[in-house]
Amino acid sequence: MAFSWQEQIKPAGTQDIQCDIEYLDKSYIHVYLDGVETTGYTWTSATNIRLNTALAASTTVLLIRKTEREYLYIEFASGSPFIEVNVDSQNTQFLHLAQELVEGRAIPGFYGTISMNGYRITDLANPINSQDAATKSYVDAADALLGQRIDVEAATRKAADDALSMRTSALENTFISGVETVSYPWSTVLAEATDEVTPGLAFTKAVVEINGVGQIRGYSFEIVDNTILFAKTLPAGTVVAARLGADVTAGDGFATQASVDYLADSLGDLAYLDTAEAVPDATGAGDVVAKLNALLASLRTSGVLAS
């Protein structure tokens, strides 16, 4: 049982409040409605307080006694008679101050560091102002919310990184990768529905268009073993155009060993597709020229080339 305060939830329409707290003076009793002190009331008796306006809604009504602590209630030195009733009143002031100190309701605040000596502060309300103490449940809820926000941000950033990686990969697989590239234009009209095409050329990269619309490598198509694999099946009649190519290491001349190797491989593939023209022998004594002449000789022997 509390001696210096009382708290009740009063319904809407309440105007009279019963005060069950002992006090020496009515001015020591303070009235709070939902945590806000009010002076809009009058005393109708020693134990009844009437609000100037009835409560509009259910309200927590708190009465707190705050006994005068700076001055003695009875001052014998000022001429108050030293009689039983005055001695009792003075001792009552001391008793009330002790009760208020123990119950803590009248303490206006602390002005120094507080040590709980390892004990907890319990039954706290959730914070409202920026400097209010926070409960564990409030912090846990905020932490969970922050975790959700971090997860969403991480997912968003990953999606952005993946998109950037795809765009970078597509850029690296075009013909501006910083090294010399050999490339071949190629196109076809699909005779039947398919999700892959094999141009018959050696290549490691491609700029691909479907019916004139550019495609993105790693998203709408991929290249595996000189074959273009599409993300979905293309219907018959689709026009597929591409610039096929591969990066090579630049040499000192106009053609590199690697570029002629790719040319030789592709020329051989084209020959067996009956699309090669008669090609004269190359001149010179270099390794590359010898390889090309050997290829031409084999094509003539097989009857693919007429001259």
From Swiss-Prot:
Which coarse location class describes where this protein primarily resides? virion
- Pfam families per record: Phage_T7_tail
UniProtKB keywords: Viral tail protein, Virion
> Which residues form each disulfide bond in the chain?
none
Q: Where in the cell is it found?
A: Virion
Q: Does the keyword Ribosomal protein apply?
A: no
Q: Which GO terms describe its cellular component?
A: virus tail
On the tree of life, the source organism's domain of life is: Viruses
Briefly state the protein's biological role.
Anchors indirectly the receptor binding (RBP) protein (depolymerase) to the virion.
Recorded protein name is Anchor protein
Which source organism does the UniProt entry give? Klebsiella phage KP34 (Bacteriophage KP34)
Q: What is the lineage of its organism?
A: Viruses, Duplodnaviria, Heunggongvirae, Uroviricota, Caudoviricetes
